[in-house]
């Protein structure tokens, strides 16, 4: 079995019942992907941390748990008890930005999947018909597109540009090429779905 931990921030406008219900649902979704959620980390905050979704102390707590680490002196009150489980993923009960996911991943030391990614992965695994698979792929590509935009910003003005090689136009970066491929693939899939619907009639 694969082991995961879940994490969520409770905002002031979310009731305890709503919050726990959403987390319970995430744990059930995780089971569908073959994960056993062995611990859940929650935090009440006025807003999400813009850098990495969770606050610094909570991120350190998760890092210690995932890595079986006793923690730094600053966070010496943290109790580490991961029961020997090898944690392969942190499941976040919200949709978070690519930079938040990456920062969280770097800090806690395991893969980070937000709620949207978990749901899309379930759809992908369960899609049986050609039309269903095409629709799921469109959804996944749509999820990836803004993440590529953010990656391009982080890559800086160069964006690893090289002119006119490997199918790229002059000065087109890898990221721009990826985004163009995504747009082309979405258009292709949408056309496939239209064709399949016409064939059924």
List PLM regions with ranges.
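Acidic-residue sensor for enzyme active/binding pockets
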Residues: 25, 105, 137, 172, ...
């Amino acid at each position: 079995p694969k082991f995961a931990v879940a994490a969520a921030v409770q905002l002031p406008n979310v009731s305890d019942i709503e919050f726990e219900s959403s987390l319970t649902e995430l744990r059930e979704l995780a089971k569908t992907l073959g994960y056993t959620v062995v611990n859940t980390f929650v935090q009440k905050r006025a807003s999400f941390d813009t850098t990495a979704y969770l606050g610094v102390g909570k991120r350190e707590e998760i890092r210690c748990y995932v890595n079986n680490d006793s923690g730094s002196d600053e966070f010496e009150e943290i109790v580490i008890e991961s029961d020997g489980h090898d944690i392969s993923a942190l499941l976040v009960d919200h949709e978070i930005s690519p930079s938040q996911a990456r920062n969280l991943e770097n800090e806690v030391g395991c893969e980070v999947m937000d709620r949207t990614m978990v749901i899309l992965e379930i759809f992908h695994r369960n899609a049986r018909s050609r039309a269903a698979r095409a629709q799921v792929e469109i959804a996944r590509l749509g999820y990836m597109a803004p993440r590529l935009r953010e990656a391009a910003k982080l890559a800086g003005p160069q964006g690893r540009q090289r002119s006119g090689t490997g199918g790229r136009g002059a000065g087109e970066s890898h990221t721009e090429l990826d985004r163009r491929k995504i747009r082309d693939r979405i258009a292709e899939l949408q056309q496939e779905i239209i064709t399949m619907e016409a064939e059924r009639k």
